[in-house]
Amino acid sequence: ALESSKIGKQLRVSEEQLTQYLNRSSSGNFGSGQDIPYTSVNFEPESSLLKRDYLLHSSGIILGGQTSAALELLLGKMSAHPDGLPVLQSHMNDYNGLYSLYFEKAHIAATSLDVDDIRHLVPGIPLILLSLYKYSVGFYVQAGNPEKISSVEDLTDPKVVFMNREKGSARRVYLDRLLKERGISSEKISGYRNEAVSDMSSASAVFEHRANVAFGEEMIARYFPGLDFVPVTDMQMYLAIPAKSVKNPGFSALVEIVQSEDFKTEIHHLTGYDTSYTGEMICI
């Protein structure tokens, strides 16, 4: 059996536990409903890599995507809901989350990509996009913005060192598209090939003076008193769910939570995110 730690109804498996399990695992059936025993272990709960062999033995909901305060709130409410299911969140970027959804390695993908991008990455599968929140994205800069960075054109200044996001993240997709629209070559941006795998690590790079500027969501800048934030655009966070799953137990509980006024109020107070469209569903 795969050893795990249970936090409410959230199932957390460390990468070390998963590796040990995969070394001795035999094949099974995805979605077979076989329960995983919850046992007490000495490992600290960690996000695990999403593995096919693990999914074959999973009985809960696999959510692919990067974490956020709003998602943590949602998962906490799923734990308390009478119809909620155990949730394992696998931390990955937008592209990989949707890739996992397409190949049935995940049940839900959290993504901030545009609707057209989502449709193209998950072709032939009817999806429901459940809107979570809208949030501001822009540049992390040193306090006082000494390099006077206000637009993507300013990234070409030879004195400016940029910390990029990894390919497949919504931030990278947006930035690359913007560079193409403005006719700006990435070769003119010092540090373009330097990649961070989260907004937190991007902001840390600027805070620690390893870069002059990075691109990420506004809320993360609040954790770094030595940083300022320059807004560039707004992004919408969606939960992409196969349409056939929405009315199933567990999934319907998730939709109910997101559409509740309590959830909208708590998200707004906790994060300042725009909840004007929270709970709305788009069929694609």
Regions found by a protein language model. Name each.
Residues 73-83, 153, 165-194:
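Ligand-binding cleft/hinge of the Venus flytrap
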Residues 131-138, 224-256, 275-283:
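Periplasmic-binding protein-like
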Residues 132, 141-162:
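Flexible hinge/capping segments at coil-to-helix
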Residues 95-109, 195-211:
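Short helices/loops that flank or line small-molecule/ion binding pockets
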Residues 110-122, 203-233:
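A ligand-binding cleft/hinge motif common to bilobed small-molecule-binding domains
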Residues 1-96, 102-106, 122-126, 152, ...:
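N-terminal hydrophobic or amphipathic helices and topogenic motifs
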Residues 143-151, 184, 244-250:
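Short helix-loop capping/hinge motifs at secondary-structure junctions, enriched
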Residues 56-67, 153-173:
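Short loop->beta-strand "edge-of-pocket" segments that line small-molecule binding or catalytic clefts
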